[in-house]
Amino acid sequence: RSETGKRLLTLPNLLACLIILLGVSLIGYFILFPAWGYFHSDCTDTILWAQAGYDAGGLFNADFTYACLLPFGGQLLMQPFIGLFGVSTTTHAIGMLLFLALFVTAAVCFCRSMKWSMSWAAIMVTALLLLLSSSEKLREIFWGHIIYYSLGILFLLVGLALAFSTLNAMEAPGGLFTR
């Protein structure tokens, strides 16, 4: 039960979780298996940036030429695993799965900050995941490597979730807009 006394484990909530699980499973399957048939030089940037940072012992390597400098880029998700698995498909897959988890979390938080039910949030998140996987180029951009395209959407979801949450707090009883 939640703090308001409502049951959390209801049939709609259970179905919502299954819907999101279906979408995440499809993308996770793509990241772990078919993606390697589409892996090419455009997909290597994130893992090579992670290796450069790992070799330098920091976030960035002064001796490495970056195509674009992303202080909150995907290399941060892969860099800890370079020491364990090296520059490998395992490291890349772990980083991409972590990005998927962050992306789904941000999308769910965005929907919930707009006061959508969990059922509608699940439908929207799954539809978003499937839409972003609808072509070979979109799959490469979002699930093949982590660069400003995919990070832009992630940061947009996080920023909007924070904005809506702030507005909700200000409109709540005792909030800034209710005085």
Outline where the language-model segments fall:
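N-terminal membrane topogenic signal
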Residues: 3-19, 117-118
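Transmembrane signal-anchor helices characteristic of membrane glycosylation enzymes that use polyprenol
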Residues: 11-39
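Transmembrane-helix motifs of polytopic, lipid-linked glycan transferases
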Residues: 17-21, 94-120, 158-162
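Membrane-proximal lumenal/periplasmic loop motifs of glycosylation machinery
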Residues: 32-41, 54-79, 89-90
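Alpha-helical transmembrane segments of polytopic membrane proteins
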Residues: 46, 92-99, 145-156
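Juxtamembrane segments of multi-pass membrane glycosylation machinery
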Residues: 58, 76-98, 103, 114-116
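Membrane-interface micro-motifs in multi-pass membrane enzymes
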Residues: 67, 71, 118-167
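Short hydrophobic alpha-helices at membrane interfaces in multi-pass membrane enzymes
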Residues: 165-179
